[in-house]
Amino acid sequence: MALLEIQNLTKRFGGLTAVNQVNLEIQTGEILGLIGPNGAGKTTIFNMVTGIYPPTGGQIYFQGQRIAHPSLTWRKRLTTPVWWLSWLPIGTIREQWDEIRTLRPHEITERGIARTFQTIRLFNNLTVLENVMAGPHHRTRSGVWGALFRPPKQREEEVFIVAEAERYLTFMGLQEYRDELAKNLPYGHQRRLEIARALATEPSLLILDEPAAGLNEQESIELMALIRQIRASGVTVLLIEHDMKVVMSICERIVVLDYGKKIAEGSPAQIQNDPRVIEAYLGESEEDEEGGGAEEPGRTGVGEEV
């Protein structure tokens, strides 16, 4: 059984179809790359997998359980008995309701999916340690009253969270910066910090959206080593990346999107030599070649950054 399975996934924004009938599977322990020209629908897929957008059509399954479903119209909700009872704290009712709705982002995180973003999203005025402490919050149980009165259980959980945060800071090579404000870190370290916070949620699947963006060559090499270590620790990795050196070096399998559709899937060697992929990146066709091989604006070669 695939760890993550996407079936006929579609997303429309008004009259624009951003993702069109995409099928994709990722197996446990794999590093899978999702690539394509800008606007191909890559991040939209990530946003549907993590509950930010509900799909217009299709299904998403994680560990065999459906986590995303097209939004229910109000008419459909009113005629669905379980919707009327969904507020009740009864396990069987909640399970039935979960089968016909898209889970919220925090619920998907609790299921075992964590992500980073194209644009770094940190708590800039918190320390490096405090940023990572936000990761394992869903694994604790103390609430408002615990924070106010600080019973022994609250203090135990705080010790646990700090220890977990420091473990992931050490793993990502950031321990010496634990007391620095996040906004004062160099850009490359901010990228690492965002990954450390995601890892602190203890995910089975880590989704990285352009983790090498803005990094220099040495930082990219170090990032690749870290991603391999993450996979070796038992975490499956799904990534979007425009740096083809990174993609071709660490991904066992690559899926290519163009204009919202999957056009190719295979090993790095297969993808590099696939004429459909070359055409998508170069914008070439037989007519283009006759006219001098004109390049479509905004698209570059498979071996170059996009």
Mark where each language-model region is.
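Intrinsic disorder/low-complexity segments
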Residues: 293-305
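Glycine-rich phosphate-binding loops of nucleotide-dependent enzymes
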Residues: 1-290, 306
